[in-house]
Design a protein with these regions (language model features):
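Intracellular effector-coupling site of seven-transmembrane GPCRs
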Residues: 177-205, 209-211, 217-252
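Alpha-helical transmembrane segments of multi-pass membrane proteins
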Residues: 42-43, 73-85, 113, 148-160, ...
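Loop architecture of class A 7-transmembrane GPCRs
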Residues: 21-23, 95-114, 141-148, 158-206, ...
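Intrinsically disordered regulatory tails of 7TM GPCRs
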Residues: 1-23, 138, 145, 294-321
């Protein structure tokens, strides 16, 4: 009887192990398919649509240099980010086996977070310039927008640097590792990780949200129909930034700071979905331009709202273009 019981226990253990392995394989397959579909769509549509936006905005630069400059800069940022998705696509396709070197592992993460920070900085500085800087001030500095855009890229280049330090290939996987000791997790490594994710939340999300909200309160009210349409589109791309990046940054911060009190299912399924959502941000802006503008020609860019504000300030009729 004892021998039969041992065989029964052994069979039960084997069945449990096989069940866990099947569940793990099924989970990995689902996550892999989510990434493959998302990355493929972002790579194809992100590169194509952002390239189209760059061409259109450059053609409309003479009619509306202010808006076209910011739209071009955003599209260029998202174009680069979309192009580098090819590494993540190949990574998911090869069952998360990284065979492309340590440098590309670091650069891929650096470009991703650089895109986030540059977008946040551009939308923030654009909001400030629209709320504070008037047309007369802009005339004194014709390259004011170019300077602000360059400043946005410089800020992003600095804030994304932790990826160059932490990202590395370990056991054929491209992961974040903030520990100097390769064999174990240290308190110093955990502290560095917490500092980075909190910094991304505060500077990448919270500060831009506050700046955009305050700028919205202080910006001039426009009665012009075209101005309103343009403002709605710009507002939509600002909201989209927080909707697409917010979950990933917030969940990553929670994972690093309060892991023990979180539901494991939330991180197991929520974080991969949030990561895919953040990746999709690179293509959402062109979609907003075309859908909200009801035209692939992006005619809403032809209107210069700064000139409209200047006419209003002088008490003249609204200027329609």
């Amino acid at each position: 009887m004892s021998g039969e019981d041992n065989y029964t226990d052994y069979d039960t253990i084997i069945a449990e192990i096989e069940s866990r392995e099947n569940a793990t394989k099924q989970y990995q397959h689902v996550i892999r398919m989510i990434y493959l579909i998302t990355y493929s769509v972002v790579l194809i549509l992100g590169v194509t649509l952002n390239f189209i936006v760059i061409i259109i905005s450059c053609l409309k630069n003479k009619k509306s240099p202010t808006v076209s400059s910011w739209i071009t800069a955003l599209a260029l940022t998202h174009l680069v980010s979309s192009a580098f998705i090819v590494y993540q696509l190949l990574y998911a396709y090869n069952n998360f086996d990284w065979n492309y070197g340590n440098a590309s592992c670091k650069l891929s993460s650096y470009i991703t977070y650089g895109s986030m920070f540059s977008t946040a900085a551009m939308l923030s500085l654009w909001s400030i310039s629209s709320a504070i800087l008037k047309i007369d001030c802009l005339n004194l500095c014709k390259n004011c927008n170019i300077i602000l855009i360059s400043l946005s890229w410089a800020i992003a280049a600095i804030l994304a640097c932790p990826s160059l330090y932490s990202r590395e290939v370990r056991y054929s996987q491209c992961i974040d590792d903030y520990d100097t000791d390769e064999l174990k997790t240290t308190q110093e490594g955990i502290a560095r990780l917490k500092a980075v994710v909190i910094m991304r939340f505060l500077i990448g999300l919270l500060a831009p949200a506050l700046v955009m909200f305050l700028s919205c309160l202080t910006s001039a009210h426009r009665n012009c129909k075209v101005c309103k349409e343009q403002a709605q589109i710009i507002c939509a791309i600002k909201i989209a930034f927080f909707v697409f990046w917010g979950p990933q940054i917030f969940l990553t911060m929670l994972q690093a700071t309060v892991t023990n009190s979180l539901d494991p299912i939330l991180l197991k399924y929520g974080l991969p979905v949030a990561t895919a959502l953040a990746t999709a941000h690179s293509l959402i802006s062109p979609v907003i331009y075309f859908l909200f503008g009801f035209s692939f020609k992006m005619k809403w860019m032809e209107h210069d709202s700064d000139k409209c504000e200047t006419v209003l300030d002088r008490g003249r009729p609204l200027l329609h273009q």
